[in-house]
């Protein structure tokens, strides 16, 4: 069964990939037809992550994406943040076993 979440009023499907430079999990949101909506994660290579952790970009155009993913049971917010440029990404635990595309 495919998980569907609502983000900015759009029905979205989370799609999991890996970042090429360090093999970390990336979460992208797509429409059910496959059109891109948002990239939920950011990659901060200088910060050590556990294999089940991701950094969520919940600011600017992605504001609200943390709540959407958490409400769907995909991630859990640890309450910690990591500096990313001039902003802060949220450190989260994956609650699902990602199927990579």
Where are these regions (language model features)?
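Acidic, aromatic-enriched beta-alpha/helix-loop junctions
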Residues: 30-74
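Ser/Thr/Pro-rich, acidic low-complexity intrinsically disordered regulatory segments
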Residues: 1-26, 35-38, 43-45, 97-100
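Generic local-structure boundary detector
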Residues: 16, 27, 38-40, 51-53, ...
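Short, compact, well-ordered microdomains
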Residues: 58-101
């Amino acid at each position: 069964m495919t998980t569907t979440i609502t983000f900015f009023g759009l029905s979205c499907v989370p799609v999991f990939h890996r970042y090429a430079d360090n093999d970390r999990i990336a979460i992208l949101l797509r429409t059910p037809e496959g059109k891109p909506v948002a990239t939920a994660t950011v990659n901060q290579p200088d910060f050590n992550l556990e294999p089940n952790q991701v950094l969520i970009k919940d600011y600017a155009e992605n504001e609200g994406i943390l709540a959407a993913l958490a409400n769907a049971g995909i991630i859990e917010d640890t309450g910690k943040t990591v500096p990313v440029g001039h902003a802060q990404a949220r450190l989260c635990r994956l609650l699902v076993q990602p199927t990579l595309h």
